[in-house]
């Protein structure tokens, strides 16, 4: 039989799974954050693929399918500076923005890293700060 890749999840599946793993308060905070993000010009949320439900957040042209921020339904998140699925890896964010984000998150100069946080509030604050940085005009 053929090997199937990671499952493509829907946004609703992501929200259902997120709700199971978070306190009511954290879930509400996450939901509010995503609702606000959906209304933000230049930002786009897309359900992603993975072992568990995942969403990715993209910026700018919808035709540009590189979504630098990813969030798993277990409340963990990551940021990608380059699309590692292309050869050679293609920059997702310009170097100046990537540097600012690395400084903000304490990330090394790798192509991607986890966004570390001790709470959902801290995680969302970091994602908001990164989003703001990315959406700033050049």
What are these regions (language model features)?
Residues 2-116:
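Polyanion-binding interface signature
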Residues 108-138:
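Charged, low-complexity intrinsically disordered regions
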């Amino acid at each position: 039989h053929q090997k199937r890749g990671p499952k493509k999840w829907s946004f609703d599946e992501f929200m259902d799974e997120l709700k199971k793993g978070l306190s009511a308060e954290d879930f509400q905070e996450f939901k509010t954050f995503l609702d606000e993000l959906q209304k933000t010009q230049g930002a786009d949320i897309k359900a992603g693929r993975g072992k568990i439900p995942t969403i990715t957040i993209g910026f700018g042209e919808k035709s540009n399918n590189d979504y630098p921020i990813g969030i798993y339904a277990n409340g963990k998140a990551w940021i990608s500076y380059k699309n590692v699925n292309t050869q050679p890896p293609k920059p997702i964010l310009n170097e100046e923005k990537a540097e600012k984000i690395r400084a903000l998150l304490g990330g090394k100069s790798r192509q991607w890293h986890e966004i570390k946080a001790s709470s959902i509030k801290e995680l969302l604050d970091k994602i908001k700060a990164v989003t703001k940085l990315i959406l700033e005009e050049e």
